[in-house]
Amino acid sequence: MTLPYISDIQLFLAVLVSCAGVIAWLGLAARLHHARRNAVPVRIHVAGSRGKTTTARMIGAALRANGKRVLVKTTGTDPMLILPDGSEQPWPRWGPPTIAEQVRFFREAVRQKADVAVIESMAIEPEYLWASEEYLVRATHAVVTNVRPDHVEVVGDHPLSAANATALIIPRNGQLFVADEAAVAPILDRATQCKCQTTIVPVAGLHHDQSNRRLALSVCD
């Protein structure tokens, strides 16, 4: 059986059409994600070296008590989804954690008719922190619990490396709630650049549970 001859031009055109189809599909997927994300009017992105999970849970609980339909996602070893009725279910993963799962989270938020999404930041690398906020979450509120020298192999060992990385989740024209211990130059400078209204929450000297609670309640006031 003789295969039909395909010229270089025909092959090029076939590849070009295939690439155009992929680009069109990606564009459609991006528009669908943006529509779902924007259907959730309040999006709270919780970041920091320690206390993110506890703070995200507390924010969700306080907002539910105020009658809001809140969907919360925590990350870590055992990621959980906290539904608007307060019940919990494991967040399914089929491979390593990836910021792309925020797309699936917002799909679930729309399905749950949530008017508030609380998302624990799951990125460590600066480029992923930036991409998560810029392309996936577009938070209305950012919360920073602290900026301590964790993951130095990723963010570097400079005293302000963690702050420089964490600052990348600060949203444009949003609101920032930052614990006073984390209110350092990279965080505050980024907030100014992003025209983000900043609230510095005094937590110095408090036990970490009390610190998380005060920060969470400040967001909900």
Show the residue positions of the predicted features.
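Acidic, Mg2+-coordinating active-site environments of NTP-dependent enzymes
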Residues: 41, 112-118, 139-221
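Active-site signature of alpha/beta-hydrolase-fold catalytic machinery across serine-
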Residues: 57-61, 218
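ATP-dependent carboxylate-amine ligase catalytic core
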Residues: 34-41, 60-142, 146-164, 185
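N-terminal glycine-rich "phosphate-gripper" loop used for MgATP/nucleotide binding
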Residues: 26, 123, 181
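Short, basic phosphate-binding NTP loop
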Residues: 2-47, 54-58, 66, 202
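Short polar catalytic/cofactor-binding loops
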Residues: 49-50, 76
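Residue-level recognition of alpha-helix initiation/capping sites
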Residues: 28, 54, 100, 182, ...
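Catalytic cores of large soluble enzymes that bind and process phosphate-bearing ligands
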Residues: 12-19, 51, 94-98, 154, ...
